[in-house]
Each structure stands twice: as C-alpha cells, then as structure tokens.
A protein has these predicted regions:
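N-terminal glycine-rich phosphate/pyrophosphate-binding loop and immediately adjacent elements
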Residues: 2-130
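Extended, hydrophobic alpha-helical segments in both membrane/secreted and soluble proteins
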Residues: 11-16, 223-227, 231, 240-244, ...
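Generic, well-ordered alpha-helical scaffold segments in large soluble proteins
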Residues: 19, 23, 169-173, 182-185, ...
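Short Gly/Pro-enriched turn/cap motifs at secondary-structure boundaries
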Residues: 78, 158-159, 298-303
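Rossmann-like flavin
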Residues: 92-197
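Helical element adjacent to the flavin cofactor pocket in flavoenzyme catalytic cores
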Residues: 203-254
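Mid-domain catalytic core of redox enzymes
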Residues: 245-326
C-alpha cells in the first residue's frame, strides 16, 4: 500500500485525501491549524457562529462525489438548500435586481432596467455556455503543471478570448451599467478583479445556471465537519498543528516532509493544497523549482485581500437575501 501525504486541510486537501484513500493509498493529512477548513474556517463569538470563508456552494456534485466514493450518501449527513435569489443587488440609483434560478423572472427584471439588454443577455449566456463547455468540462481536468501543456491549450484559451477581462466580456453584450456590474461580479468570489480577471471566469455564470447555488444548513463549518468525519471513517490520519517547514526532493520528485516541530516523514505520494507560490519558493526553494514554476512565480499576481466585518443580530431581516450586494 502506497503511503500518501496531503498538505493543507482546505476543501482541496480534503478532497485529495479522500480520492487517494478511495484508490487504496494509506493517507495522512497535515494541517497547520487546530481545525480543518482552510479558508472555510468557523469562529464563535458572543454566542454567534460565523463562517469566515465561503457561504454558498456552486458545484454541489463535487461534494456528492466524495461520499459516493465510499458507497455513502451526502444527504444522509447534510442538507444543501437551494437559494432564491442567488444574489440581490441594490444599486446606487435605488433600483434592485434579483439574480436567481427563475429565467423568466430574471429576463423580466432585465427588461424593466434596460429593454435593449434582454437579447444581449441571452447572447451572453450562449457565449458563456460555450466557454463553460470548453474551459470547465474539457480543460478543467487537465493539469497545467508544465509550460508545454499551457502552450498546447493556448489556442483554446485564445478562442475563448481569455485575454479579455470579465467586465469587457459582459460589456460586449450588455449596455446598462447596473447590469454590467451584476453579471461581472463572479470573479470577486475567487478574489479576482472583474476589470482584470480573464473572461474565462464568465463560465461561473453557466456553472451557476447548470447546478444552482446552495446553502449548507448549519453553515459551511457543518460541511467541513461531516467531511472530517468521513475521512476518519475511512481511516485517513489527520494531523493538526503540523506546519511544514520544507520539502526534500530526490530525482526531481518531492519525497519527504519536514515539519517545524523537528519531525520528518517520507512518502510515496505527496499532494499540496497550500499556496503554490509559497510551496515553490519557501518549501522547495527557488533553486530546485522547475522552469515552469519559475516562470509562473515571476509573472504571477496575488489576488486581492478582504477586510470583512462580521455582525451578530437577534433580529431577522426578511428583505435581505442571503447574498445582498450594495
């Protein structure tokens, strides 16, 4: 049985650990904090429980798959409740726009704001579907870990106009500034700037239309907790407060983890869910990284950070949707 290690207990690390285990590997997951979740951390204060990271689920099938790998059903442990609307926009001119699953209702709202944009939206959706089919369904499963791989798929990226920004893409089809804002907001979900992020991210619009947007009852922390239980049921070892200090390489392969507590372990398979630039520059070292990673590190730009305020309220605001954006 191969020995596998996963660095990082975010959703990516959890998924990697479960998939490795389903293929027969003996898996150990190392998390530097005292809880799993990564950006999906949970904190409690004054009797309130806050999800510090994501609060919606846009590709539920990915989580269903993880339970199905072991003959289990997600619905036996979790409830994904569909949201309607998905987002509510309150604009500076006092107009409101609900973006949600009801196509006819949404088209009616677009017509009230800008009649000329109804046809434009349908054309935009058609093009977004094309980007989704090519960018998500055909390319998302391919690893872009080598420079030649990126070059190979460059024509497809050009075909999708990946050199344009999401806002430029949306503006080709919609005229009204409020609608342009509403339909170019998706990059913010991944820390991107709509005016700079590649138009490939317009596929998120199609992804939302295809699978919907859901809230996990009990919060995202509930989802993390049930995935943690699933890992434990399957014999995955979870090591908390294990901070990786550096990685040893042998024959151009990473073979050993070294931790800040002085311990080290060798593995047959190592998967990292940590920040790629941190891994290549700090954990591996600049002198040992590949030409591809050196190229990426030189030109990569970090996404924006956020300043987030969390409020606790004893009152329910029925006119405030789950995601309300001013």
């Amino acid at each position: 049985m191969k020995q596998a290690a996963v660095i990082g207990g975010g959703f990516g690390g959890i998924a990697a650990a479960l998939r490795l285990r389903s293929r027969g590997a003996n898996v150990s997951l190392y998390e530097r904090l005292d809880a799993l979740g990564g950006r999906a951390q949970v904190f409690k204060k004054n009797g309130y429980i806050h999800d510090a990271g994501p609060t919606v689920i846009t590709a539920p099938y990915l989580f269903y798959e993880l339970f199905e790998l072991f003959g289990e059903k997600l619905d036996d442990y979790l409830e994904f409740r569909p949201l309607d609307p998905w987002y509510r926009f309150n604009f500076h001119d006092q107009t409101q726009f609900d973006y949600g699953p009801n196509r006819e209702k949404m088209l009616s709202q677009i017509e009230k704001i800008s009649p000329n944009d109804v046809g434009g939206y349908l054309k935009m959706l058609k093009e977004a579907n094309t980007i989704f089919e090519l960018g998500y369904q055909k390319l998302a499963g391919h690893p872009f870990h080598k420079l030649m791989t990126m070059i190979k798929y460059a024509p497809a990226i050009i075909k999708m106009r990946g050199y344009e920004s999401v806002y430029t893409f949306v503006s080709r089809y919609l005229e009204h500034p409020n609608l342009r804002q509403a339909f170019s907001i998706q990059p913010l979900l991944v820390g991107g700037n709509p005016f700079q992020t590649s138009s490939i991210y317009a596929l998120i619009h199609s992804l939302e239309q295809k699978w919907g947007i859901y809230f996990c009852m009990g919060g995202t922390g509930k989802l993390v907790k049930e995935l943690e239980k699933l890992m434990l049921r399957q014999g995955i070892k979870i090591k908390y407060q294990h901070d990786v200090e550096h990685l040893s390489t042998r024959n151009n392969e990473i073979s050993e983890l070294h931790f800040t507590n002085g311990h080290s372990h060798k593995f047959d398979i190592i998967v990292s869910n940590a920040d790629p630039i941190q891994v290549s520059t700090e954990l591996i070292g600049r002198k040992k990284i590949s030409l591809h990673n050196a190229f990426v590190n030189k030109f990569a730009k970090h996404s924006m950070g956020l300043f987030v305020l969390f409020f606790g309220s004893k009152k329910q605001y029925k006119n405030v949707a789950h995601h309300t954006i001013w």
